[in-house]
Amino acid sequence: MNIEIINPSEDQYGNRKENIFLAFGDAGNYLGSAYTYPTINYHQTYETPYLIFVAIHMADDMDKVLSDEVMQMLFDKMFARANEIRMQNPDLKARIYAGFEQDKDKLDFYIKNGFEEDYSIIMDADIPHNFTYMLPESVNVEELKLDSDQEFMKYKLLYDEIFVTPLDGNAYTEQSQQKYFKNLSFIVDDKLVGGCTIFEKDGFGYVETVYVLPEQRGKGLSKIIVNYIFNYFLSNGINKTRLEVWELNKCAVELYKSFFYNEVEKNLMFPVITL
């Protein structure tokens, strides 16, 4: 089979078309896709601030031999582009990395292609039954409802600037269907300063995200948000909480430890090449 890999005709989901690769077979049938996406993030990974995310998605129900061939071809195109992107900021230490992958075969694929192991940490904490918290009068909390594509894209642009893994629309939709789901914005003087997404999963109050805008950091807002989250969970009868954080995000790890989160497990989640 002849395999053709092309760029899309236009930018997609806030990413440049040159960073996206689509694979098709002889009959024009879709075989898979890959993309790379750069961001500069001094807050989460200050030692390697230039982050270049890569991802591969294969079509369903493909023959394994064909799937392996297409995946390698997509990887080669994507990785070459990631290295081109890296050279756009040669003065910064960079990481080319894959995101959260539950597929062990795909994780092994990245390792086989020269990526090194990197880990996320699962952390749990108990919320004391007598825990109470009053939000400061200067802080308002608003629920963010993404009822249109335009609203989702606005949120995605914000999310992708803050977090090391771009927002996945399907994953967000799945989370939004969980019990007690909230996407919250924290407002001071009518301006967004931070936010979080939370829900109940497997009996835990799950903290998917906590963020503070770069210009608002150092003011204790992260602790305000986490305290608010604890109070929200406890008000809904949930007294234990769980989250997952990149091991390299030392600021976040220390924040959660200050709330008595303890490490319970490590996952190979971010295969990486440091340049």
Predicted regions and their residues:
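Conserved acetyl-CoA-binding loop-helix of GNAT-fold acetyltransferases
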Residues: 66-84, 212, 218-235, 253-258
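A structural microfeature
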Residues: 32, 114, 119, 192-194, ...
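Conserved hydrophobic beta-strand within the GNAT/NAT acetyltransferase core sheet
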Residues: 96-98, 207, 241-245
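Flexible, substrate/cofactor-facing loop regions flanked by secondary structure
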Residues: 134-205
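Conserved donor-binding loop and adjoining core beta-sheet/short helix segment
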Residues: 7-82, 193-205, 213
